[in-house]
From Swiss-Prot:
Summary of temperature dependence: Optimum temperature is 40 degrees Celsius.
Residues that bind S-adenosyl-L-methionine: S91, G129, N153, Q157, D179, V180, V195
A Pfam family hit: CMAS
EC nos: 2.1.1.122
Subcellular location per the Swiss-Prot or TrEMBL entry: Cytoplasm
Described purpose of this protein according to its UniProt entry: N-methyltransferase with a broad substrate range, accepting protoberberine alkaloids (R,S)-stylopine, (R,S)-nandinine and (R,S)-tetrahydropalmatine, and to a lesser extent (R,S)-canadine, (R,S)-tetrahydrogroenlandicine (cheilanthifoline) and (S)-scoulerine.
Record pathway: Alkaloid biosynthesis
Protein name: (S)-tetrahydroprotoberberine N-methyltransferase
GO molecular function (one): (S)-tetrahydroprotoberberine N-methyltransferase activity
Inducing factors: Up-regulated 2 hours after elicitor treatment.
PANTHER family registered for this protein in UniProt: PTHR43832, S-ADENOSYL-L-METHIONINE-DEPENDENT METHYLTRANSFERASES SUPERFAMILY PROTEIN
Amino acid sequence: MGSSAGEIMGRLMKGEIEDEELKKLIRHQWDRRIEWGYKPTHEKQLAFNLDFIKGLKEMVMSGEIDTMNKETYELPTAFLEAVFGKTVKQSCCYFKDENSTIDEAEEAAHELYCERAQIKDGQTVLDIGCGQGGLVLYIAEKYKNCHVTGLTNSKAQANYIEQQAEKLELTNVDVIFADVTKFDTDKTYDRILVVETIEHMKNIQLFMKKLSTWMTEDSLLFVDHISHKTFNHNFEALDEDDWYSGFIFPKGCVTILSSSTLLYFQDDVSALDHWVVNGMHMARSVEAWRKKLDETIEAAREILEPGLGSKEAVNQVITHIRTFCIGGYEQFSYNNGEEWMITQILFKKK
């Protein structure tokens, strides 16, 4: 679109790109990704997807999670509370209608997970990659006889969940601070939930095998992930003109699977049900986060500056988050939410 990747990044970090121009620049990158991902025949599309899946099976279990934690997840809790909804859900929310607020959409998403994962009172539940614990706390409050365990590799997240559970006087919550790829246990769980976490895995076959060892014959595994309806891709730069992908996520951190790719990983589990959620739900989520950030921008700066040390560092973080939200809207609203979307699959142990 005329400017080099370096020029665009230079202008972006100086605050010289208005939102409307930024939307066009990002949309151009998604146009290019679509052109790259779709093949001229179904035979070539299938071969392309199978090559990608074969490549995943030859990799280590996960991507560069530590790098991503530092850059994306270890922001002050007060900042996260200012930007996200009441449960600090940093994944797709579910908007039941045009008037749904972000708080209502967070709750509706948790409700949908419980319905599709067939959560019932009295079960043991493990939430892998549990974030700030919104789903853990939702289940623990709603199903008083469930014992809910959250697993996170962020100490800040683990501390936050423990504090919230204490505040809510919940005695049926545990938090495990661990990297899931290195963690192991002899325990089994009635339900295992993996919400927008499998994107950080590479060798999904190894990951699913590990999860299956924590399941009994009656256990169910519910996986929710960002997807494209047709093709797989790493969230990495296509070429030197792609300034956007590497700015949003460090290389090697995020893989976006197609909506059917997990069906190729049934060595240790078997799919029972399969759903997709239109991408506009994610588009509306990131748009709500951006609006909340813009509305509380001065307070957000004050929260961030002590930890980051300078106004320049604060500006960089805010630019990154706003670009993530604007880019996410362009991605998930593409073709009215019928390109990138959320896929959900329910598995049982084989």
